[in-house]
Design a protein with these regions (language model features):
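Fibrous stalk/shaft segments of extracellular and virion attachment machinery
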Residues: 1-29
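Glycine-centered loop/turn motifs
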Residues: 9, 25-31, 60-62, 101-102
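Intrinsically disordered, low-complexity regions of eukaryotic proteins
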Residues: 21, 35-37, 97-98, 115
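Generic detection of short hydrophobic beta-strand segments and adjacent strand-loop junctions
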Residues: 26, 30-34, 52, 76
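N-terminal beta-hairpin/loop module of FHA
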Residues: 29-45
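Acidic, glycine/polar-enriched metal-coordinating patches/loops
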Residues: 44-123
Length: 123
């Protein structure tokens, strides 16, 4: 590239990393690693209170975690690299009603700081 710029439409989804174009089903457990470099969308149906431990976070990158309620009173929380970190909830609450879909969008804004929202399908 002689102009120092990419040509219009030269970067397509085929050319970006899998961390931006794939989904990853997480396995239910008390603590689950969510590797920021593994996928763009993560899915989970928890079977107990669950801590989602963010690993390999990249500042400025957002991820989606779709958590399907298990029909109990389970909760979902966050850590980063096994430590507390700062998780700023913008809006919404987790709903563990059976089959309820919780759309969690989380953005890394610092090495250990994240902002997130939780939404459900409108009724």
């Amino acid at each position: 590239v002689t102009t120092g710029k990419l040509a219009t439409s030269s970067v397509t989804s085929v050319k970006v990393g899998t961390e931006f174009t794939t989904a990853n089903a997480l396995t239910a457990a008390a603590t689950i690693d969510v590797d920021y470099t593994a996928a763009q969308v993560f899915t989970l149906t928890p079977n107990a209170n669950t801590t989602l431990n963010i690993t390999n976070a990249v500042i400025g990158v957002s991820k989606v975690i779709v958590v399907t309620g298990a029909g109990g009173t389970n909760t979902v929380g966050f850590t980063v690299g096994g430590s507390a970190g700062t998780f700023n909830r913008i809006s919404g609450t987790y709903d563990d009603t059976a089959a309820a879909k919780n759309f969690i969008q989380i953005t890394c804004v610092g090495a250990t700081e994240f902002w997130y929202t939780i939404s459900q399908i409108a009724t």
